[in-house]
């Protein structure tokens, strides 16, 4: 997605050898116009897949996921990272390691929101090592639902996430694919859309 790549080049900051900070439009402050366009691109790609739910993980995946769900006309569910006292029964969980935060969290979704008849599109802000998406796939499978595809806003292709997910049989579609960081700059590879 050319507009997304242009925004990354303009407003993204490379930190070290493998971190991209995009807090001005995605991970802290949200550019809803851009998120709406991202949601529409994902909806255009997956509109014939029979998607019944969009699933993401809190927090930065919520904005692109909600606009994708809106464009598809389906509900959006986000996995919670913190234990919630109101979620008391039928909880589906998975362990997820965060590359950026360097911590493992137990993420959860109330089982009543997913059923075996659901065809799920996973949406996330970043793909690095693939652990967040893998955890969501695990939760969706616990519900007996099917994962139709995984939509990623920004993929760091030099990390192992895509391989991990594709080796598990998942279709991965990334709107921006970063091949490498070179001299503090982003070098893009060919995106999927």
Swiss-Prot record:
Source organism of this protein record: Streptococcus gordonii (strain Challis / ATCC 35105 / BCRC 15272 / CH1 / DL1 / V288)
Name of the featured protein: Xanthine phosphoribosyltransferase
Subcellular localization, as worded in the UniProt entry: Cytoplasm
EC number in record: 2.4.2.22
Reaction equations catalysed: XMP + diphosphate = xanthine + 5-phospho-alpha-D-ribose 1-diphosphate
Binding site for xanthine: 20, 27, 156
Any single Pfam family the record assigns to this protein: Pribosyltran
Single GO biological process annotation from the record: XMP salvage
Listed PANTHER family: HYPOXANTHINE/GUANINE PHOSPHORIBOSYLTRANSFERASE, XANTHINE PHOSPHORIBOSYLTRANSFERASE
InterPro entries: PRibTrfase_dom, PRTase-like, Pur/Pyrimidine_PRTase, Xanthine_PRibTrfase
HAMAP family: XPRTase
Coiled coil (residue ranges): none
A GO term for molecular function: xanthine phosphoribosyltransferase activity
Pathway involvement of the protein, from the record: Purine metabolism; XMP biosynthesis via salvage pathway; XMP from xanthine: step 1/1
Signal peptide: none
Function in brief: Converts the preformed base xanthine, a product of nucleic acid breakdown, to xanthosine 5'-monophosphate (XMP), so it can be reused for RNA or DNA synthesis.
């Amino acid at each position: 997605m050319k507009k997304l790549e242009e925004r990354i080049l303009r407003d993204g900051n490379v930190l070290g050898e493998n971190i991209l900070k995009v807090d001005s439009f995605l991970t802290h402050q949200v550019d809803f116009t851009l998120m709406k366009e991202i949601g529409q691109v994902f909806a255009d790609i997956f509109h014939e897949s029979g998607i019944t739910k969009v699933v993401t993980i809190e927090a930065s995946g919520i904005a692109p996921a909600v606009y994708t769900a809106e464009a598809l006309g389906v509900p959006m569910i986000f996995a919670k990272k913190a234990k919630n006292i109101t979620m008391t029964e039928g909880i589906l969980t998975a362990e997820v390691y965060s590359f950026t935060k360097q911590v493992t969290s137990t993420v959860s979704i109330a089982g009543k929101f997913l059923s075996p008849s659901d065809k799920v599109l996973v949406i996330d802000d970043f793909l690095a090592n693939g652990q967040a998406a893998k955890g969501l796939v695990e939760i969706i499978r616990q519900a007996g639902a099917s994962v139709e595809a995984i939509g990623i806003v920004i993929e760091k292709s030099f990390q192992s996430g895509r391989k991990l997910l594709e080796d598990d049989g998942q279709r991965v579609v990334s709107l921006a694919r970063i091949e490498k960081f070179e001299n503090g700059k982003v070098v893009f590879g060919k995106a999927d859309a």
